[in-house]
């Protein structure tokens, strides 16, 4: 069941990563990018904690937020 929900949450991330982000300029302030971070977090921690970490990271990614290398814990 965990794998099903993880895959379900990865689908919109992959859609964004391979369809939408190709049409927009790179704007993520972090390495790895927020979409790659979300993929890594969901695969490593599953749907609950992975989604929490991904949302937390996306909310930090703005002009007044931090920048630089920020790996999945």
Swiss-Prot record:
Bilayer topology annotation: Peripheral membrane protein
InterPro entries on file: Membr_insert_effic_factor_YidD
Keywords: Cell inner membrane, Cell membrane, Membrane
Family matches, as Pfam families: YidD
Keyword Cell membrane set for record: yes
Domain of life: Bacteria
A Gene Ontology cellular-component term: plasma membrane
Compartments reported by the entry: Cell inner membrane
Job of this protein: Could be involved in insertion of integral membrane proteins into the membrane.
Classification via NCBIfam families: membrane protein insertion efficiency factor YidD
Family to which this protein belongs: Belongs to the UPF0161 family.
Protein name: Putative membrane protein insertion efficiency factor
Phylogenetic lineage: Bacteria, Pseudomonadati, Bacteroidota, Bacteroidia, Bacteroidales
């Amino acid at each position: 069941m965990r794998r099903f929900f993880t895959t379900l949450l990865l689908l919109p991330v992959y859609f964004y990563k391979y369809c939408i982000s190709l049409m927009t300029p790179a704007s993520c302030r972090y390495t790895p990018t927020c979409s790659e971070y979300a993929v890594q977090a969901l695969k490593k921690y599953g749907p609950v904690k992975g989604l929490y970490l991904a949302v937390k990271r996306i909310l930090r990614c703005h002009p007044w937020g931090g920048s630089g290398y920020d790996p999945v814990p």
